[in-house]
């Protein structure tokens, strides 16, 4: 019996050793950052067209807040913000396209939720825009609050948290309504414009953008009610922690740059600074780039290419844009908002 046990143990150990040696001999799967470097460009998923976030002009040039984030990531890697391909995705396509590897990064006004992380195997790399769901009506409806939307027809994009929030809010307030769900945001807007429904619900930032597409924007009113928290941010697959960490810190770098007063126009001064926190940011001290798999100048390259968070916001969404959305919660924590980034240390 004892000899049999010893033989079994020796056999088991031999098998384990063989498997270990075989595994060690297999080539390591390339991470997303290595794949992007080898390809020579970043594949970034964006919306099909949302003013302020991602839109393509007649010449095929992309612009917007989400688009600029992709360019910041490309600049951090390649020192060239043009080394990115934009892949337009609908709400129903976006997460599956990311999971399938059709894009490296999703920067597409997507809300961070538990279900999306836990069930879909995705990781949200922080928040780039704190939003909330609202309602747009035609002035002829005369409502002044979402609580006055009883017996209305409401257009909503299917397969979104917006659709779920709508049901929760109206049922909890005993409001009867007819939901009109559409596969795309464009279809929902078209139905609202044609009068098939008299209410359109989306994130408030999107409603500001959609109103500009109407023949007479002044005829539409965005109600003051905000019925949800919609933390929007870039998304990666959860099977590549190194890539997730890189994308997350590109996000944080833009916020930290605003706090430090580093802009797209003063990077030369930042590089000559003697302040320890600025020197760490520009890569003159510390080995933070190496920790991310790139060189130490990654953060300053991103800011030089697209600007700090304030520059991104004001150019695409704020006072310098067509939308004119106040920063509100998206102001720095030191300025009355909740925008906050960990230190680069």
Identify the role of each PLM range.
Residues 2-16:
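Bacterial N-terminal signal peptides that target proteins for export
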Residues 67-77, 139-143, 147-161, 206-207, ...:
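Extended ligand-binding regions for polar small-molecule ligands
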Residues 84-96, 179-194:
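Short helix-initiation/N-cap motifs at beta->coil->alpha
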Residues 71, 75, 79-148, 204-227, ...:
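Acidic, polar ligand-binding/catalytic clefts
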Residues 288-345:
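C-terminal functional modules
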Residues 43-52, 62-77, 111, 131-183, ...:
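Bilobed "Venus flytrap"/periplasmic-binding protein-like clamshell domains
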Residues 30, 34-109, 292, 297, ...:
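Extracytoplasmic small-molecule ligand-binding "clamshell" domains
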């Amino acid at each position: 019996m004892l000899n049999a046990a010893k033989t079994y143990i020796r056999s088991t150990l031999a098998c384990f050793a063989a498997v270990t040696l075989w595994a060690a001999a297999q080539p390591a799967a390339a991470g997303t950052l290595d794949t992007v470097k080898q390809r020579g460009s970043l594949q970034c998923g964006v919306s099909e067209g949302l003013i302020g976030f991602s839109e393509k002009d007649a010449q095929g040039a992309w612009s917007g807040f989400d688009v600029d984030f992709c360019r910041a990531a490309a600049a951090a890697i390649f020192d060239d913000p043009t080394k990115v391909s934009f892949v337009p995705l609908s709400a129903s396509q976006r997460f599956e396209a990311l999971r399938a590897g059709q894009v490296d990064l999703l920067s597409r006004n997507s809300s961070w939720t538990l279900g999306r992380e836990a069930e879909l195997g995705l990781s949200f790399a922080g928040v780039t825009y704190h939003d909330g769901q609202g309602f747009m009506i035609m002035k002829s409806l005369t409502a002044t609050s979402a609580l006055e939307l009883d017996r209305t027809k409401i257009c909503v994009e299917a397969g979104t948290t917006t659709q779920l929030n709508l049901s929760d809010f109206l049922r909890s307030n005993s409001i009867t309504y007819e939901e009109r769900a559409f596969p795309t945001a464009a279809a929902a807007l078209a139905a609202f414009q044609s009068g098939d429904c008299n209410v359109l619900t989306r994130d408030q930032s999107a409603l500001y953008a959609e109103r500009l597409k109407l023949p007479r924007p002044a005829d539409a009113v965005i109600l003051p009610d905000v019925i949800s928290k919609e933390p929007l941010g870039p998304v990666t697959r959860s099977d590549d922690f190194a890539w997730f960490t890189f994308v997350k810190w590109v996000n944080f770098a833009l916020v930290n740059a605003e706090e430090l007063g580093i802009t797209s126009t003063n990077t030369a001064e930042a590089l000559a600074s003697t302040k320890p926190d600025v020197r760490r940011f520009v890569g003159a001290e510390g080995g933070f780039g190496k920790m991310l798999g790139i060189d130490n100048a990654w953060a300053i390259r991103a800011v030089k290419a697209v600007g700090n968070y304030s520059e991104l916001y004001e150019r695409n969404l704020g006072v310098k844009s067509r939308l004119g959305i106040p920063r509100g919660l998206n102001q720095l924590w030191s300025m009355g908002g909740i925008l906050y980034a960990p230190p680069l240390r």
